[in-house]
Each structure stands twice: as C-alpha cells, then as structure tokens.
Amino acid sequence: MGNRHAKAKSHHGFDVDHDAKKLNKACKGMGTDEAAIIEILSSRTSDERQQIKQKYKATYGKDLEEVFKSDLSGNFEKTALALLDRPSEYDARQLQKAMKGLGTDEAVLIEILCTRTNKEIMAIKEAYQRLFDRSLESDVKADTSGNLKAILVSLLQANRDEGDDVDKDLAGQDAKDLYDAGDGRWGTDELAFNEVLAKRSHKQLRATFQAYQILIDKDIEEAIEAETSGDLQKAYLTLVRCARDQEGYFADRLYKSMKGTGTDEETLIHIIVTRAEVDLQGIKAKFQEKYQKSLSDMVRSDTSGDFQKLLVALLH
C-alpha cells in the first residue's frame, strides 16, 4: 500500500501498573486530572492502551470506558473512548453507528471501507461480529442498495492485490475496459469499475489511470464525475484518490473538516485516531506541503480545551 510512515511509539519504560494507577488517581474524588489522562493516552501505542485497560479492570474491578463516560464529556470524551478501542473496533463501532436506526450514513461506510487494507478489513469484520454479534457484510447488504452495495460488498471481500509488481499489459486492458464500461457507451457498466477499483493494487491502479489518460486524453476522475453521481461517485472517487495518494487524500479530508465556519469534529477524531500508527506522519507532511500550514496549528485554531490538547498531543 505504498509507504506507510508508521508511528508505533512503543515506549521504553512503559509501565502498565504505573499507568493504571495514574489513571485511577486522575479520575478519583472531586474533579478530574485531564492532563494526566491526555499524557497517558497520547503517548502509548494502541497495544499498550489495551494492556492498561485490562490492568485497570483487574486492579479496580471496573471498566476504564465506563469511568471515562462518567468523568469526561463532549469531544474530549469521544476521543478518549476512541483511543481505548483497537483501530478495528473503533472502525466497527463507527460502521454500526452509521447503519443503526433509520437512514444510513453512507459517507462513513465509504470513508472506512474504501480506504482500508485487506488485513484491516478482515480485522474490522471480526471486531464487528464480536462486538455486535452480527455480520458486517449482511448489515451492509441490508442497508445499501444497487451499485453502491455492489462496490462495498466487493471491498468487504478483502481481495485486493497488495503486491508491488505492475503489469503494463493488464493496465492497458483495464483502462480499455473502464473506457468501454463508462465513457465509451450509454450507461455505465459498474461491474468493470468494481472489478478494477476493488481488486487491483494501488501501484497497478496508478498505471491503469495513466494508461486511461493516454487512451482518451482524460482523467479517470473526469469520467467518473460525468458518468456517476451521489454515493457511488463518492466511493469511486475515494478509491481513485487513495490509489493515487492515500496520505494526500486524508490531508484533504482533514483540511475540509476544518476550513470555513464550523468544524467537523467526527472526521477530525476518526482520521487522527485511526491513522495515528499507520501514516499520520506522512499525512502531516502532505498537509504542510499542500496547505502551507501545519496540521497541528490548524487543529489548535479550530478546537479548544482538553479536546484540543489531546488532538495536538496525538499529532506530535
């Protein structure tokens, strides 16, 4: 999946007993020591936070999540709880929330399923089954329809080639198939798009997009914009943008969540928490390059209080 600047901050001197004790003290009695909570949550890896959760429960006989729910509030609470989940569990909860009740938040399904690796998709499916005792694929099938359902179900198979080899002949053939399926005829044959966008490696897709450009002197994005609409268009464009430059895609999403009036805190939390140990360093560099300002500075000016402090700490 290209270069992933991992930020696995495994700490020398990680002491699970000390952290559990410190968190207990931070949440005991009158008032909460938010600074202590921020310091621990932001400077431990996801695996270390799992150990802290287990230690806390074994020592104090209660779930750290429940303690946070009663002691914290607002976006600070949301972020702290997100950090107590494994990334796959957090994604699974977001997906369930997007589908439960009336109506479906398709944007969340697209954002998660179109941007995860095979291994991540498998982990999300397993977490969803474990947390909700339901199949993610069945729920997605029941909650979406038509061509959007088809592409999401294809992605849920976690069948993308993740090798490094590029087959030039295949790229040419795929480009021709995409042209025949879209621009080349009335109505779009989504099957060809699903086959290519859900199964080829990012490197292979970049070769296909190049071949497409040469073949008809047009970007694949332009064809998708002309031929599709709504959520299907959003899904295809997300897949294309991630194949072209995944870190750039997330940098754009973060920028859009903050620019103008109002802030989309859900997107901010979701991206910063789930990319923290994947490619957040690369996303930060891309953000600086594209927008001539640091992601931390923009987060600082767009958020406030303990929520701001926790996000900024996660970005360092």
UniProtKB/Swiss-Prot annotation:
User: Which SUPFAM superfamilies does UniProt cross-reference here?
Assistant: Annexin
Which Gene Ontology terms describe the biological processes this protein takes part in?
negative regulation of Golgi to plasma membrane protein transport; positive regulation of Golgi to plasma membrane protein transport
Alphabetical keyword list: Annexin, Calcium, Calcium/phospholipid-binding, Cell membrane, Cytoplasmic vesicle, Lipoprotein, Membrane, Myristate, Repeat
Which molecular function term from Gene Ontology is one that the record holds?
A: phosphatidylserine binding
Domain of life, per UniProt, equals: Eukaryota
Q: Which GO terms describe its cellular component?
A: apical plasma membrane; basolateral plasma membrane; cytoplasm; exocytic vesicle; membrane raft; nucleus; plasma membrane; vesicle membrane
Q: Mark the Annexin repeats by their residue spans.
A: 14-85, 86-157, 169-241, 245-316
Pfam families cross-referenced by the UniProt entry: Annexin
Q: Which topology term describes how it sits in the membrane?
A: Lipid-anchor
Question: Could you tell me which PANTHER family the record lists for this protein?
Answer: ANNEXIN (PTHR10502), ANNEXIN A13 (PTHR10502:SF175)
This protein is called: Annexin A13
